[in-house]
């Protein structure tokens, strides 16, 4: 069962977010563009997941807690390919964390308020 409304799951530049089975997206969260959320993933209040200029992938059974920002790094002169955001399975992203153009492996706990930036691998 998918719990979300069309207003908070939005297309961007021809890409519409895709969600697996039993995904929960709180009505106050926003998921935009080239985003895939794995089975049994939860996205809690006031989260922004914005795959506008690159892709975002979140594995199965992950939890994106209140107030998180998940974004990508666009291509530019110093980084011609940009950085997607890749999050593994069974990951918990603590309240108000910011993940930007990085890779987080499986079974990782990202602490509340953490910031993980472009190109980092955890």
Please give the residue ranges for each predicted region.
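Terminal amphipathic alpha-helical/low-complexity segments used for targeting or macromolecular assembly
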Residues: 1-22
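Acidic/polar low-complexity surface segments
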Residues: 7, 13, 74-77, 81-83
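Active-site/ligand-binding-proximal alpha/beta "capping" segment
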Residues: 121
């Amino acid at each position: 069962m998918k719990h979300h409304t069309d207003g908070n799951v939005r297309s961007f530049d021809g890409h519409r977010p895709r969600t697996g089975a039993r995904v929960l997206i709180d009505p106050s969260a926003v998921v935009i563009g080239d985003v895939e959320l794995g089975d049994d993933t939860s996205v809690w209040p006031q989260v922004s997941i914005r795959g506008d200029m690159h892709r975002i992938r979140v594995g199965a059974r992950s939890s994106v807690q209140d107030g998180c920002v998940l974004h990508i790094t666009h291509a530019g002169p110093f980084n011609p390919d940009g950085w997607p955001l890749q999050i593994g399975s069974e990951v918990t992203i603590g309240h108000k964390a910011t993940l930007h153009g990085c890779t987080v492996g499986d079974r990782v706990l990202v602490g509340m308020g953490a910031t993980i930036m472009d190109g980092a691998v955890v």
